[in-house]
Amino acid sequence: MHDIDFIKNNPELFDEAMQNRNFGKIAHKIIELSANKKHTLTQLYSLQKERNNITQEIEKLKKDNIQCDTQIELSKEITKKINHINNMIKTDSELIDLLNILPNIPDKKVPIGKDENDNIEIRRYGKKVDFKFPPKTHYELGENLNLMDFKQAAKLSGSRFVILKSQLAQLDRALANFMLDVHTQEFGYSEISHPVLVHESAMYGVGQLPKFADDSFKTTDNFRLIPTSEVALTNLVSNTNTNANELPIRLTACSQCFRSEAGSAGKDVRGMMRQHQFNKVELVSIVTEEQSELELERMTQVAEEILKKLELPYRVMMLCTGDLGFSASITYDIEVWIPSQNQYREISSCSNCKAFQARRMNAKYHTISNGNKVNKFVHTLNGSALAIGRTIIAILENYQNQDGSITIPHVLRKYMNNQDIIKNNNY
């Protein structure tokens, strides 16, 4: 949600920001709708004050046994006008509807561009494996080892699902435990276990609704399955006012995530790259305005640390204005090397949403200045660290051997009964 006062004071700057995010000029419309709403509310407050005065007059006249029919009729007329204006306010949602679909303002650092082709590479890490044989895809490796089953998953649930067996199921669990251990023990995040079904208000709070309603699954009783733990973790501070001394708050969780993948027809049809259901470890930070810039750098480095420990080659990209997520002001994507595709693919996205989500959630913090309490909206950040399915893909492809077996990364072996090789499963 945007600050209307900022739009009023900076209409040209706001229009430029929206144009860079592929929206037209809209500031004038917002200012006009806001002025109309303010005028309507002024009328309402004036009528309410007038009715209160008449009510007091009626009570006084009755007490003195003086006739007050005229005042009673006038009170009724004013009440009708108040009810009419209240109904207008309830039904006139044009301003809110407009603000709800406008994305966040890009940070000044964000490069201007149309799509992913205009993203900027920030840094690279790791050396790509020089295979002495043609590398197989993750799904060829998984199916050949009898550890990855898409056919049985399709019988159960349809396309874009997978069944992992034996050592790959262990790898999935090992990765979650490994990532959470790093985040909590080395970087001070607090682990949270949370519901995967949430109210639509929680989805609205982080910007998933109303614009992206088709991208998530909805139950018959109006719950939503979360597309990411960001929804649950960020909403833990909705409608709160935190003491600034308690910030930053750093949270992490591993959860199942659910996405309809609307608009993804034909993309990554084979394999685990794009699934309706997957596991992901998420990071969320709740910080002050002054802390948020450095917090994004820290969060990105935390996500990178997982890939460094797994010894997987990757690069960090800064997204351009045309590729930014709806709620993000600035985003770093971390892309891991996928040998079979001969390209880097996204495995993490770390974003600073500044106060955009906080306004939707009414999440504030307070400081004391000159003896007075000062309230501000918190800044929220989120990052994948990491998407577990895509990490499995990267491990299978980068650690594959010529015989089709997979070497288990050293840091994961203690989570997998000290095994060092993933090999054919007899089940």
From Swiss-Prot:
It comes from the Bacteria. Pfam families: Seryl_tRNA_N (PF02403), tRNA-synt_2b (PF00587). GO terms for cellular component: cytoplasm. The keyword ATP-binding applies. Pathway: Aminoacyl-tRNA biosynthesis; selenocysteinyl-tRNA(Sec) biosynthesis; L-seryl-tRNA(Sec) from L-serine and tRNA(Sec): step 1/1. The keyword Cell membrane does not apply. One of its GO terms (biological process) is seryl-tRNA aminoacylation. Its main location: cytoplasm. Belongs to the class-II aminoacyl-tRNA synthetase family. Type-1 seryl-tRNA synthetase subfamily. Consists of two distinct domains, a catalytic core and a N-terminal extension that is involved in tRNA binding. Homodimer. The tRNA molecule binds across the dimer. PANTHER family: SERINE--TRNA LIGASE, SERYL-TRNA SYNTHETASE. This is Serine--tRNA ligase. It comes from Ehrlichia ruminantium (strain Welgevonden). The lineage of its organism: Bacteria, Pseudomonadati, Pseudomonadota, Alphaproteobacteria, Rickettsiales.
